[in-house]
Design a protein with these regions (language model features):
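Active-site-adjacent mobile loop/cap segments within catalytic or ligand-binding domains
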Residues: 124, 144-178
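Active-site/substrate-binding loop(s) of hydrolase catalytic cores
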Residues: 4-145, 157, 161
């Protein structure tokens, strides 16, 4: 029997992205569609275990008010404590960042995808970038680029696995919006 591989995906680490008010909910919806699909088509996973965190920043998605970068009024893109979770992977100030880090470590993934919107690009592992960019029709690939304070940077450095940040083209490009 082949060894199972684990794909770990998290969505909406920013409760707000940059397209419109509370657009992070689109990413949560997309995650839930994937979960529903694979619950009903489990055999398609073959030799994979799929772990999906539909909403890494629930406070930002549900109650956030803006997409400001970390500052004393940032809440939406950032946590209620004004911390951008995807820029917190060195200091781990936010409880959400620590919880996500610990869950990722517990799951022992083989591959990691960090799902965002709406820059039409991938950032990280060149092989994953090629696959994801082709499947989603994304324009830009920033290969082998792992910012140290981003989730993909920490995962790549500490878990030594392929990691990619995926930026959908636009909110209308995800399956739940078509």
């Amino acid at each position: 029997t082949p060894v199972k591989k684990t794909l770990f995906m998290d969505f909406a680490i920013h409760g707000f992205e940059d397209e419109y008010y509370r657009d992070g909910q689109v990413l949560v919806n997309e995650a839930n569609v994937l979960i529903d699909y694979f619950v009903n088509h489990i055999k398609e996973l073959k030799n994979y275990t799929l772990v999906i965190v539909p909403c890494a920043n629930p406070d930002g998605v549900i109650a956030g008010t803006n997409n400001q970068r970390a500052c004393n009024t940032a809440f939406g893109r950032c946590t209620a404590n004004h911390i951008d979770i995807n820029r917190d992977w060195g200091s781990f100030r936010a409880v959400e960042t620590r919880a996500l880090r610990d869950f990722i470590k517990q799951c022992k993934p083989t591959f990691y995808l960090n799902i965002h919107g709406w820059l039409n690009e991938t950032l990280g592992d060149s092989n994953l970038n090629a696959i994801i960019s082709k499947e989603l029709g994304l324009a830009k690939k920033m290969n082998n680029n792992y910012p140290s304070n981003y989730a993909i940077g920490w995962v790549h450095k500490n878990l030594k696995i392929p990691a990619t940040l995926v930026e959908y083209k636009s909110s209308s490009s995800v399956s739940t919006q078509k």
